[in-house]
């Protein structure tokens, strides 16, 4: 059963300007180590960061809180499954909020779709509760 849906559209140019202005201060506050490593390897790092930023915003909306109530950018990270499919890893307040949404006997699954077409990056998040195995 679907328990949360969120989407976000991010202007890559805005992220590019933020990277130029704040650099590591922005990336270390907003992104996980894994996200920083992956984005810094990309030829268009602003696009990579923008997709991840959109994913965090979309995830916070799917959690039903936005970026408040203990849900912070640093508590959500884009990770890839062994197949390469992207998903979200949650910690702290984001993980606590997710746990509170899931009915007893169910396990959460976070589906993530990312895309970009300059100057925009977009993310969709669907949080599903499936029977625990």
Curated annotation (Swiss-Prot):
It catalyses: apo-[ACP] + CoA = holo-[ACP] + adenosine 3',5'-bisphosphate + H(+). InterPro entries: 4-PPantetheinyl_Trfase_dom (IPR008278), 4-PPantetheinyl_Trfase_dom_sf (IPR037143), ACPS (IPR002582), Ppantetheine-prot_Trfase_dom (IPR004568). The keyword Magnesium applies. It is an enzyme of class 2 (transferase). Disulfide bonds: none annotated. GO terms for biological process: fatty acid biosynthetic process. It holds the Pfam family ACPS. SUPFAM superfamilies: 4'-phosphopantetheinyl transferase. It comes from the Bacteria. One of its GO terms (molecular function) is holo-[acyl-carrier-protein] synthase activity. It is found in: Cytoplasm. Belongs to the P-Pant transferase superfamily. AcpS family. Transfers the 4'-phosphopantetheine moiety from coenzyme A to a Ser of acyl-carrier-protein. This is Holo-[acyl-carrier-protein] synthase. The gene is acpS.
């Amino acid at each position: 059963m679907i328990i949360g849906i969120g989407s976000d559209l991010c202007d890559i140019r805005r992220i590019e300007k933020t990277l130029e202005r704040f650099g590591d201060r922005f990336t270390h506050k907003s992104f996980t180590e894994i996200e920083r490593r992956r984005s810094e390897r990309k030829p268009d790092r602003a696009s990579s960061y923008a997709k991840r930023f959109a994913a965090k915003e979309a995830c916070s909306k799917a959690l039903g809180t936005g970026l408040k109530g203990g849900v912070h950018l640093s508590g959500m990270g884009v990770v890839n499954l062994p197949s390469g499919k992207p998903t979200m890893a949650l910690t702290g307040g984001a993980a606590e909020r997710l746990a509170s949404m899931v009915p007893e006997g169910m396990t959460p699954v976070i589906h993530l779709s990312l895309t970009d077409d300059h100057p925009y990056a977009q993310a969709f998040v669907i949080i599903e509760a499936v029977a625990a195995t």
